[in-house]
C-alpha cells in the first residue's frame, strides 16, 4: 500500500514540475519576443447594412409596410510582429 502511495506521489510531482517547466518556457519565449519585436496592432472592421422593405396588403385592403434592417459587423484583430532590424550599408570605398 505504501509503495503505491509513493509511486503516485512521485508521478504527481513529476507531472507538476513538467507543467511548471512548460509555463516557464512559454513565458521566456513571450518575453524575448516582446523585447526584440515591435508589435503593430491592426483592427479590420467590416460593416454591412441591409435594409429590406416589404409591402403587405392586409385583409381590409390596407397596405402595411414592414422594414427589416440587418446590421452585420465583423471585427478582426490582427497582430503583426515586425523584427527591429537595422539595415547597414557596407563601405567599400578606398580613402
Swiss-Prot record:
Q: Where are the transmembrane segments?
A: 4-24
Question: What does the entry state regarding organ or tissue expression?
Answer: Accumulates in cells differentiating into tracheary element (TE) which undergo secondary cell wall (SCW) formation.
Q: Does the keyword Iron-sulfur apply?
A: no
Gene expressing this chain: TED6
GO term, biological process aspect, one: plant-type secondary cell wall biogenesis
Compartments (UniProt record): Cell membrane; Secreted, Cell wall
Main location class: membrane
Superkingdom, taxonomy of origin: Eukaryota
- Summarize subunit and interaction data from the UniProt record for this chain: Interacts with the secondary cell wall (SCW)-related cellulose synthase complex.
Q: Which of UniProt's keywords are assigned here? A: Cell membrane, Cell wall, Cell wall biogenesis/degradation, Developmental protein, Membrane, Secreted, Transmembrane, Transmembrane helix
Mapped to this chain, the residue ranges on the Cytoplasmic side of the membrane are 25-95
The protein's name = Protein TRACHEARY ELEMENT DIFFERENTIATION-RELATED 6
Q: What did gene disruption experiments reveal?
A: Delayed secondary cell wall (SCW) formation during tracheary element (TE) differentiation.
Mapped to this chain, the residue ranges on the Extracellular side of the membrane are 1-3
Amino acid at each position: 500500500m505504501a509503495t503505491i502511495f509513493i509511486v503516485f506521489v512521485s508521478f504527481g510531482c513529476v507531472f507538476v514540475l513538467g507543467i511548471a517547466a512548460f509555463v516557464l518556457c512559454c513565458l521566456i519565449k513571450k518575453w524575448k519576443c516582446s523585447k526584440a519585436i515591435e508589435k503593430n496592432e491592426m483592427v479590420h472592421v467590416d460593416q454591412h447594412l441591409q435594409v429590406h422593405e416589404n409591402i403587405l396588403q392586409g385583409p381590409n385592403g390596407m397596405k402595411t409596410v414592414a422594414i427589416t434592417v440587418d446590421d452585420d459587423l465583423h471585427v478582426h484583430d490582427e497582430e503583426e510582429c515586425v523584427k527591429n532590424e537595422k539595415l547597414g550599408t557596407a563601405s567599400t570605398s578606398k580613402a
